[in-house]
């Protein structure tokens, strides 16, 4: 088609020359078709009957003072809204997500199901293989329907208000320090209206089996760490 179009425009090059230039300009490469996702079925968002039934995952983005982009991988247990992890880094590909989930399972135990959106890290083949090896069901919400994962969305909003929008971080290590201190405060101190104004660990102690489901592990000075960070930033 290109050859005949050029001939009509008055160019008398032969078809071999046209093809040679065409391929040299890499115009002969096929367009990559967008990968179609399988149909997602809307699932009811129900409170699990206990810990480690359903975890919810999501990513967030922010920038350091230098302008460099950072990402966070947030993981919560839907039963008591407990923040199991906030992993902060500049890049969080599928293999890194798997590594973080393996760390969580090592101390928390394995969930029956994980819920997330259709991000490329979550739909990757490596993630499907990991789920099969660990016999974990992965529930994807429908594209463009973040309300179907509203528990982690609500958590993200709180984390952004309390930390990401409140402080400007100079380095990745500083962002991690604030995130870790905030997670401890969120799990052990901050009351949640959806939990009867109990903190997640208090709710787990009252309605779950705390001894069988350890919570976010950190030293005993975690609350004072968060308070000192907040007071230091305000001064």
Task: Specify the residue positions occupied by each region the protein language model found.
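Hydrophobic beta-strand scaffold residues
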Residues: 29, 137-138
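RNase H-like two-metal-ion nuclease catalytic core shared by retroviral integrases
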Residues: 116-118, 124-129, 138-161, 171-180, ...
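Residue-level detection of the helix-turn-helix DNA-binding "recognition helix"
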Residues: 7, 23, 27, 132, ...
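C-terminal domain-tail junction helix/linker
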Residues: 47, 134, 158-235
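Basic, flexible linker segments flanking DNA-binding modules
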Residues: 1-54, 145, 199-208
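Mobile genetic element proteins and their domesticated derivatives, centered on retroelements
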Residues: 2, 18, 58, 75, ...
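An active-site-proximal beta-strand-loop segment
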Residues: 54-84, 90-92
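Active-site beta-loop-alpha junctions of metal-dependent nucleic acid enzymes
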Residues: 64, 68-69, 86-108, 120
């Amino acid at each position: 088609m290109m050859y005949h179009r050029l001939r009509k425009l008055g160019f008398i090059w032969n078809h071999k020359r046209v093809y040679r230039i065409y391929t040299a300009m890499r115009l002969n490469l096929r367009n990559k078709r967008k990968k179609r996702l399988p149909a997602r079925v809307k699932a009811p968002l129900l409170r699990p009957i206990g810990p480690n039934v359903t975890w919810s995952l999501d990513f967030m983005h922010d920038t350091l003072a230098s302008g460099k982009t950072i990402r966070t991988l947030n993981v919560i247990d839907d039963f008591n809204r407990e923040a199991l992890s906030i992993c902060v880094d500049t890049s969080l590909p599928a293999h890194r997500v798997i590594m973080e989930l393996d760390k969580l399972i090592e101390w928390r135990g394995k969930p029956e199901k994980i819920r997330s959106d259709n991000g490329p890290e979550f739909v990757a083949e490596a993630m499907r293989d990991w789920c099969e090896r660990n016999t974990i069901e992965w529930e994807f919400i429908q594209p463009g329907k973040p309300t179907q994962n509203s528990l982690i969305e609500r958590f993200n909003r709180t984390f952004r208000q309390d930390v990401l929008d409140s402080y400007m971080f100079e380095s990745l290590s500083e962002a991690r320090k604030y995130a870790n201190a905030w997670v401890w405060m969120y799990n052990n101190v901050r009351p949640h209206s959806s939990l009867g104004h109990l903190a997640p660990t208090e709710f787990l102690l009252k309605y779950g089996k705390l001894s069988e489901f350890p919570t976010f592990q950190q030293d005993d000075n975690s609350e004072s760490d968060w308070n000192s960070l907040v007071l230091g930033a305000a001064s």
